[in-house]
């Protein structure tokens, strides 16, 4: 996680260090969004995989799985948009490191794609 104390400002002689509050806020918000979307994708993928490993009754599966897959698709698209948005923005000249979050997001997107490909009619889900 990112903390204000992580910012190292070089103060010139006699000048107080200044922090660009908006950059810190932007980074913090972006970091939170990445963590949230990774968690949501992980949870939804686990729920979908649960139906594949331990099938419920046909009625439960027929009523729950389609809406769960639709929600997973929506979250996957949201994650992809967020990924593209973050890559396109200039975070800061302070070189904030979010590579670990990108790696986690990429792993969850791959896992989600693999999960969606297990189901028939996958062309409708991909």
From Swiss-Prot:
Localization per record: Cytoplasm
Principal subcellular localization: cytoplasm
GO biological process, one term: invasive growth in response to glucose limitation
Keywords, sorted A to Z: Cytoplasm, Transducer
Keyword Cytoplasm: yes
Quaternary context: G proteins are composed of 3 units, alpha, beta and gamma. GPG1 interacts with the beta subunits GBP1 and GPB2.
Protein's job: Gamma subunit of a guanine nucleotide-binding protein (G protein). G proteins are involved as modulators or transducers in various transmembrane signaling systems. The beta and gamma chains are required for the GTPase activity, for replacement of GDP by GTP, and for G protein-effector interaction. Involved in the determination of the cAMP level according to nutritional conditions, most probably as a regulator of cAMP phosphodiesterase. Required for the control of pseudohyphal and haploid invasive growth.
Name of the protein in its database record: Heterotrimeric G protein gamma subunit GPG1
Lineage per the UniProt record: Eukaryota, Fungi, Dikarya, Ascomycota, Saccharomycotina
């Amino acid at each position: 996680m990112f903390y204000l104390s992580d910012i190292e400002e070089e103060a010139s002689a006699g000048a107080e260090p200044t922090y660009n509050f908006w950059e810190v806020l932007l980074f913090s918000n972006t970091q939170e969004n990445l963590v949230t979307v990774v968690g949501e994708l992980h949870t939804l993928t686990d729920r979908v995989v649960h139906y594949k490993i331990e099938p419920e009754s046909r009625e439960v599966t027929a009523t729950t799985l389609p809406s769960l897959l639709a929600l997973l698709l929506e979250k996957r698209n949201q994650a992809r948009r967020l990924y593209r948005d973050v890559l396109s923005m200039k975070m800061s000249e302070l070189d904030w490191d979010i590579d670990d979050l990108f790696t986690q997001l990429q792993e969850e997107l791959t896992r989600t794609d693999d999960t969606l490909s297990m189901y028939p009619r996958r062309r409708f889900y991909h």
